[in-house]
């Protein structure tokens, strides 16, 4: 939990007790420091085979919070280090066990491409993340939340493919539709079924 906030559902504290030295069996960890996140991921990878899914919520705050902690520094070095730290966590996940699904949740932002077209992309800090790394390019699957007003109120979905105005992507036959229910369990189950 990068943003160090309560989870948005009833009973989360009992379902996800805090992971720390006193409780190594915990299932909830809060940190916005990339090397601490890496330590936690490595611990789960090596010592917690019963954990099959990790959700890193509000991942962009690893970048935003480091930027704010270093706001008084001048020059481009801090942006390089922020980008390198974010890149390192994502790259480390690629080397983890195959039965482990790691979900990075991030906010999106609307930018404009060279032709003036609107593009929705993952929110990042600094041009290096956008122009050199291109964060979404590091993932096989990128889903975007879609919110529409329906007959029963607000309806939440995931967009699974690029519609020309976002960087969403997934193997074309994985989800069977461009729009799917906003349900992480459904997503995890579908990915597992597709990969096996």
Pin down the residues of each PLM region.
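P-loop NTPase motor core
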Residues: 53-134
């Amino acid at each position: 939990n990068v943003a160090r906030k309560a989870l948005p559902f009833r009973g989360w504290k009992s379902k996800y007790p805090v992971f720390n030295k006193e409780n190594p069996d915990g299932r909830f960890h809060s940190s916005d420091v990339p090397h601490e996140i890496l330590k936690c991921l490595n611990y789960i990878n090596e010592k917690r085979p019963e954990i099959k899914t990790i959700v890193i919520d509000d991942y962009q705050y690893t970048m935003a919070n480091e930027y704010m902690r270093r706001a008084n520094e001048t020059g481009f070095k801090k942006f390089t280090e922020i980008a390198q730290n974010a890149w390192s966590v994502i790259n480390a996940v690629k080397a983890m066990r195959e039965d482990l699904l790691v979900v990075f949740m991030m906010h999106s932002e609307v930018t404009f491409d060279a032709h003036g077209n609107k593009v929705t992309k993952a929110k990042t800090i600094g041009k290096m993340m956008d122009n050199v790394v291109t964060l979404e390019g590091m993932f096989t699957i990128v889903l975007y939340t879609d919110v529409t007003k329906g007959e029963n109120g607000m309806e939440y979905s995931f967009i699974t493919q690029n519609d020309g105005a976002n960087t969403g992507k997934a193997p074309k036959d994985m989800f069977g539709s461009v729009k799917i229910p906003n349900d992480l369990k459904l997503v995890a189950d579908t990915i597992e079924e597709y990969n096996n």
